[in-house]
């Protein structure tokens, strides 16, 4: 079969990929990826500065912070509407109410919003309202969720999982890309050695 493809006039070149990742491999996509997040370009020479509160607590809180971070140069607003917590007794976020607050602040400031998707139950509302869907470290290897994200028409911000290797992280991005969404941004938030 391989020989057939090499002599078929419709095939320019056959390349064997040895690495496990196919879609994110520079062998097939040598140019920098530029991802548009509601008018903000991410990648290449474009600097994206995402800032905001750890958790959304009120409209006034988020609006005040949004105005401050925008004045400081941020071009996207992040805030946790849903908060993954170790303790079931800790504040878990305002949920959909928090998402509505982020949307209202976006209307006021023009800043695209970034927030973490915790459950596949919220895929539709996130696809409708969130400019950049964040997948946190705990869900980096939730492969069913990653496949569903691949069917959305929204950029995805994929955080590196706790103790995940770079290969595992890139393979998680491949799950999203293989399902059809190539707008994946990798986010490494801290050095695990400190």
Describe these PLM feature segments:
Residues 47-53, 75-79, 113-116, 131-135, ...:
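Hydrophobic faces of well-ordered beta-strands that scaffold small-molecule active sites
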Residues 1-49:
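Non-catalytic terminal accessory/regulatory regions of metabolic enzymes
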Residues 81-85, 139-194:
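Conserved anion-binding
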Residues 2, 58-66, 121-129, 166-172:
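Catalytic cores of alpha/beta
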Residues 64-80:
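Catalytic domains of carbohydrate-active enzymes, especially glycoside hydrolases
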Residues 47-64, 88-93, 112-116, 137, ...:
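Active-site mouth loops of central-metabolism enzymes
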Residues 78-96:
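Glycine-rich, proline-tolerant flexible connector loops at the mouths of alpha/beta enzymes
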Residues 91-115, 148-155:
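Alpha-helix-loop-beta-strand connector modules within alpha/beta enzyme cores
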């Amino acid at each position: 079969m391989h020989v057939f493809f090499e002599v078929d006039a419709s095939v320019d070149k056959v390349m064997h990929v040895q690495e496990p990742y196919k879609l994110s491999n520079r062998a097939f996509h040598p140019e920098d990826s530029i991802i548009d997040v509601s008018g903000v370009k991410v990648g290449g020479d474009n600097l994206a500065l995402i800032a905001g509160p750890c958790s959304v607590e009120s409209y006034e809180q988020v609006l005040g912070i949004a105005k401050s971070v925008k004045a400081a140069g941020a071009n996207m607003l992040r805030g946790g509407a849903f908060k993954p917590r170790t303790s079931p007794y800790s504040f878990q976020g305002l949920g959909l109410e928090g998402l509505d607050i982020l949307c209202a602040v976006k209307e006021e400031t023009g800043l695209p919003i970034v927030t973490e998707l915790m459950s596949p139950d919220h895929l539709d509302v996130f696809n409708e309202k969130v400019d950049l869907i964040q997948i946190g470290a705990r869900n980096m290897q939730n492969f069913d969720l990653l496949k569903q994200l691949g069917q959305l028409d929204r950029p995805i911000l994929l955080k590196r999982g706790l103790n995940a290797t770079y290969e595992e992280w890139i393979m998680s991005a491949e799950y999203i890309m293989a399902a059809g969404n190539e707008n994946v941004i990798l986010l490494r938030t801290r050095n695990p050695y400190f």
